Amino acid sequence: MSTDPDTGTPGPQLVQYTHWIYGLHALAVVIGAAGTATVVGMFLFGWPSLAAVVMNYARRSEVRGTWLESHFSWQIRTFWFALLWCVVTSIISAPLILLFGVGILTWILGFLAVAVWVAYRVIRGWLALRDSAPVLLDTAAL
C-alpha cells in the first residue's frame, strides 16, 4: 500500500483503502438513519466510523504528498468537527431544557444540522474520490 516515490501517485491499494473508509462512514450514516440510533450518534460512536478514523490515522503517513491526503484530512476533519458541533449543541441545549423546555428543540435541530452536514461531506468526498480528484478543502464548508 505505498505511493510511487517518483510521481507522488498513490497506489491502487491506497485508493481502494480510501473507498473502504468512505464506505464505513456511509454505513454509519445509513445505520443511524434506518435504525434506532441517530445519524450523529452512529457516526460519532458507532463502530464503522470509529474504525474508519483509526484507519485514517493508521495510513495517514502513506498518503502524504498525494491527492489522497486531501481525502484523509477531509474524513478526519468531518469526524472531529461533527463531535465538536455535537458538544456545542449539547452545551447550548442543556440549560435551555432546564430553564425553558425549548432545549429539546435546539438539541434536535442542532443534531439534525450536524447529520445533514456529515452526510453531505461523506457524499462530496466519495464522489471526488470516484473521480480520482482531491477534495478541495475550503474552510467555509466546515
Label the predicted regions.
Residues 1, 52, 56:
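Short, basic/glycine-rich phosphate-binding loops at helix/coil junctions
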Residues 1-10:
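Short, Lys/Arg-rich, polar N-terminal cytosolic tail immediately upstream
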Residues 9-12, 60:
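Alpha-helix initiation/capping motif
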Residues 14, 20-21, 67-92, 123-126, ...:
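Interfacial aromatic "cap" segments that immediately flank transmembrane helices
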Residues 16-53, 77-119:
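Hydrophobic alpha-helical transmembrane segments in multi-pass membrane proteins
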Residues 57-70:
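Membrane-helix interface/capping segments
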Residues 59-62, 117, 121, 131:
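Residues in soluble alpha-helical coiled-coils and helical-bundle/repeat scaffolds
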